[in-house]
């Protein structure tokens, strides 16, 4: 009975989403305030109905209702209860329901926190978000219903959740990533509303920027957590593999970063209007593209879900409709919001525009590297592979000018400035950068690698100028805002991430060895000694745990416990890496296959500064959070001066 209630709630949600898509827009056309205000009620009803359906599915997992096909395929009675809850979004149907839940949640949030925004804007934005919900609800109900039954011949035991997903990462990574994906729908809806009305000014940016910041924060956290999860779970010792689905999350992050900076220019200088709208459309369009890549089954990825052609065609059609319609609208009405401001070459606006172009170029590189093998194969031209060397080389060339401009940008004034005003500061920063980028590799690794020096030069340039500019502001008693300190934190976070990448990419040591009890291997300054392997049993798995002692200069450093697990129901073997993490290095061991004479295949790593990559990501997210506290976003705006008046 409960699954039928869940299905009924989804049908109800579809009806409400249709009303939300049409009725408020009718009110805008008629100038009827009550009809426009109904958008908030519909948003609340939509969220409640989808949340109800989602809770029904969670309950089905918790009580092991194997009459539901989705539950029977992704859970069993031996699975710990917290993984049963997380299994709700662990596969195709449930993850789509999570998407719709978060979509309705963002819609409801806009309805709640838009009391200071003119009613006609709210009606347009919520209606557009309702249209997106309609598309996904139709997709769920007709191709991916999570409440489909196994009746009358239901199994007494489920197949189990994919062992790769039986990790705390599943609890947090998909919701955070989807919060970012779906959050960009708010900026998208504001952009479409602006194009429909044909007017845009700095008020638009004030409305849109906090929502874009929130989405960007969630997406940043999702990417950081996903990278850390891959690092410790897959046993490869890597933090980024340029996997197509990793790229699918990275592309909207790049464009979203450009969008945040472009919104700052639109808010401060009423410039870059059409460019800002195009970025808002592109960010959400790339989120839809990522969904298509994961759900359609057109690519090979450790993240991709097996899917039938009907699902892929539905998503493709929906994606073409949304993206194509949005771009056509932009082509037809973009000229109505075009800026008439001429920016000086040496101004903050121009430097931000240059960095925006570099971010978009980086996105296009990732897009090309992701889709070209797919297109090449579909055209019958054979299989090609675009791997890490291509991406790393292209990003290096793009990031050097990006870092250069990023360091200088905050020092330059809006409108027009003179380079000579900051000449002395730039000279000091250049000398400091040169010294640090040569000294740090020698201090920590006793050798200098050219690519490490280049990476550290970018990081030090950004960090030195950010700290110097902040110190100057404090010494002069200049007023600072939350947005300013958020910018400083985010830029320093990027510098920290670059340091982590530079060291881990160029100084990591990897050894694949054959070890038995008593064998030792030296890596860097550490000696790894294989002690023994003992049997161990978990709630739904059994396996062995290897004990590996680590010493440094003859003194005990740590003990690593690397596991090999066999999951009973799934019938699959998994590696659980052992990691001893530190501020400046990680020691990493992964247990491979058992060999003859009591020996085991073991993979050992020395990873310097790898945790700085994720620490920098967290600092960037913190910077975004500080920007959200800026009081400008809580001021009421005069409806007569809004950027989005009724057409």
Predicted regions and their residues:
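A generic, lipid-embedded transmembrane alpha helix
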Residues: 45-62, 135, 218-225, 286, ...
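A conserved hydrophobic secondary-structure block that centers on an alpha-helix together
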Residues: 11-22, 28, 95-227, 235
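Contiguous transmembrane helix-bundle modules in multi-pass membrane proteins
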Residues: 1-34, 45-52, 66, 244-252, ...
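Membrane-interface helix-boundary motifs at transmembrane edges
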Residues: 30-39, 113-125, 197-208, 267-274, ...
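Transmembrane-helix bundle segments that line or gate the permeation/cavity pathway
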Residues: 50-73, 77-79, 86-111, 139-149, ...
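Extended, hydrophobic alpha-helical segments in both membrane/secreted and soluble proteins
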Residues: 175, 182-192, 204-262, 275, ...
């Amino acid at each position: 009975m409960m699954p039928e209630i869940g299905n009924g709630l989804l049908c109800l949600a579809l009806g409400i989403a249709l009303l939300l898509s049409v009725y408020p827009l009718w009110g805008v056309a008629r100038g009827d305030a009550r009809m426009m205000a109904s958008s908030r009620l519909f948003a609340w009803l939509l969220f409640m109905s989808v949340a109800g359906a989602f809770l029904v599915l969670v309950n089905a997992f918790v009580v092991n209702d194997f009459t539901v096909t989705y539950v029977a395929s992704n859970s069993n009675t031996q699975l710990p209860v917290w993984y049963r809850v997380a299994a709700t979004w662990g596969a195709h149907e449930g993850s789509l329901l999570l998407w719709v839940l978060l979509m309705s949640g963002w819609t409801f949030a806009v309805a709640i926190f838009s009391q200071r925004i003119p009613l006609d804007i709210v009606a347009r934005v919520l209606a557009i978000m309702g249209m997106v919900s309609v598309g996904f609800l139709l997709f769920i109900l007709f191709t991916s219903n999570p409440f489909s039954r196994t009746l009358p011949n239901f199994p007494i035991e489920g197949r189990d959740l994919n062992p790769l997903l039986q990790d705390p990462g599943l609890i947090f990574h998909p919701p955070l990533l989807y919060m970012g994906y779906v959050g960009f729908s708010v900026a998208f809806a504001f952009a479409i509303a602006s194009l429909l009305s044909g007017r845009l000014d700095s008020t638009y940016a004030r409305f849109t920027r906090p929502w874009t910041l929130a989405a960007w924060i969630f997406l940043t956290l999702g990417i950081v957590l996903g990278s850390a999860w891959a690092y410790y779970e897959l046993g490869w010792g890597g933090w980024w593999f340029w996997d197509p689905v990793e790229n699918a999350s990275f592309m909207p992050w790049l464009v979203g970063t450009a969008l945040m900076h472009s919104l700052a220019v639109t808010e401060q200088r009423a410039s870059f209007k059409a460019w800002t709208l195009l970025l808002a459309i592109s960010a959400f369009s790339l989120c839809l593209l990522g969904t298509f890549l994961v759900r359609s089954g057109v690519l090979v990825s450790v993240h991709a879900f097996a899917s039938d052609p009907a699902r892929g065609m539905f998503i493709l059609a929906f994606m073409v409709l949304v993206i194509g319609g949005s771009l056509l609208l932009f082509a037809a009405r973009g000229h109505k919001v075009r800026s008439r401001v001429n920016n000086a070459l040496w101004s903050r606006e121009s430097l931000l525009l240059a960095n925006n172009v570099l971010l978009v170029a980086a996105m296009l590189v990732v897009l090309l590297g992701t889709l070209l093998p797919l297109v090449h194969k579909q055209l019958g031209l054979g299989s090609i592979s675009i791997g890490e060397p291509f991406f790393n080389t292209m990003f290096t060339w793009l990031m050097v000018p990006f870092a250069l401009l990023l360091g200088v940008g905050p020092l330059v004034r809006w409108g027009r400035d003179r380079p000579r005003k900051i000449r002395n500061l730039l000279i000091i920063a250049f000398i400091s950068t040169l010294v640090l980028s040569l000294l740090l590799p020698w201090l920590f690794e006793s050798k200098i690698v050219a690519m490490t020096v280049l990476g550290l030069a970018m990081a030090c340039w950004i960090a030195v100028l950010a700290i110097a500019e902040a110190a100057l502001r404090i010494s002069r008693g200049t007023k600072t805002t939350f947005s300013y300190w958020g910018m400083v934190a985010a830029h320093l976070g990027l510098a920290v991430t670059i340091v982590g990448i530079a060291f881990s990419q160029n100084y990591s040591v990897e050894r694949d060895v054959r070890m038995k009890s008593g064998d030792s291997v030296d890596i860097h300054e550490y000696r790894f000694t294989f002690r023994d392997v003992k049997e161990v049993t978990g709630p739904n798995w059994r396996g062995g745990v290897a004990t590996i002692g680590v010493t440094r200069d003859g003194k005990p450093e740590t003990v690593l416990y690397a596991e090999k697990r066999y999951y009973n129901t799934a019938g699959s073997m998994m590696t659980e890496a052992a990691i001893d993490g530190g501020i400046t290095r990680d020691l990493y061991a992964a247990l491979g296959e058992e060999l003859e004479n009591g020996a085991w295949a073991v993979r050992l790593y020395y990873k310097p500064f790898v945790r700085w990559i994720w620490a920098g990501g967290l600092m960037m997210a913190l910077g975004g959070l500080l920007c959200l506290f800026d009081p400008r976003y809580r001021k009421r705006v005069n409806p007569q001066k809004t950027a989005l008046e009724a057409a």
